[in-house]
């Protein structure tokens, strides 16, 4: 997090300004004194020209009179001259000159100039970047009670810039600034209480400091408060409060708040679902470069308006920022030639970008492509590696495919025990192919003791999800009473489902089962199947 921005408002003159008539009188008096070389009068006259108080505003004349006062060593004027040089007011923007005048005022102990000089050193503007010098000048201003400098000192200790990282010292300076009501320091102090860095974790205290900052209009604090209300984290879950705080931050251009408002309207969380409102917030956030918002706009154009050309524009913006979900979606568009000519190599390029960042679907899809040689040379070892990466994220299809490759005698690492372990992990997540594979293993006693009851259970889990071969095997077991009770009606039901799915041999088994059934039972089960189908 960078230091807080430099001060930009000129210091006030000591002249009284109450009405236009008095301004004119002041002007005449000050002008006479200024022309005689009175530095304070020159400074006050510069202030009047800067603000257009009683006279026509003129940055050029403000610069002139500030310059005369500054040349006489008046620190207020030196500071204001530095501000005008830094902002390019009445003169071409010149950080070198700004640093020169800040230095003059800072060496006289002027805290605001010390702060701004520290900021220029921190940013390397007009001076060589020097964290040590930034630290020095922030320290001098902070010791005079300047809250912004105290906050920036805290940040330098926080990040180890110019000093060894020291969370305790960071908190010390944040607290000094926070107790003066400095919103950014209040927020930073809240973050430390939230994370328990340099202080005993106290999330209630964290929330209290964040609220103080939020109520002063500090957008990151408003966003954090909204998150707490949205998720019921520390604060009671309250969608209305969450939306209110997101709106306050979003109104200040806080991109993550704009994005979260888009999500809320997109999903109808605490408000009626409103896709147009969601899009409006996504557009605001995306316009500020928010990658997730750009990705969601891409999804809208792809799946809503089916404008693949616009979709790829937004995906590309997010993908260029390294957003893995957008990289994956861009790969899909290249693969299928949607919104652009199909290009297998570009698809693989973007899949790999996403996969390298841990995008589980991209890892799985790369595994498939290396297994089957789609867009890349076939390489079962690489296929296994990508499946393994996705499997480690508990992605059940990858766990299953990892098992399949370990099961292959011609695979890169044949290991039937490892295959069985992979199937178990996938099956526990409800993956029907893995459940069927475990059913077969228990049915045949492969790597596990033969156990028809266990086979029955695994087949049943897969069959209920529509796995046709599991339906066939379960039907055969029910017809023979193997692993479970002999039940011809259940056998007929499962075999009928297998027949409907076109499983070889199922129709013959169904006829054989029907031949063993009583006519009344056969009528009843056929009526049951008709009712299900109808």
Placement of each model-derived feature along the sequence:
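Hydrophobic face of amphipathic alpha-helices that form TPR/SEL1-like repeat modules
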Residues: 44-51, 80-87, 116-123, 152-159, ...
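N-terminal segments that cap or nucleate solenoid repeat domains
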Residues: 2-51
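Predominantly extracellular beta-rich ligand-binding scaffolds that present long acidic/polar faces
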Residues: 439, 475, 486-488, 494-495
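Terminal, low-structured helical/coil segments at or just beyond the last alpha-helical repeat
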Residues: 2-4, 504-534
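Short helix-capping/linker turns of helical repeat alpha-solenoids
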Residues: 22, 35-38, 51-53, 58, ...
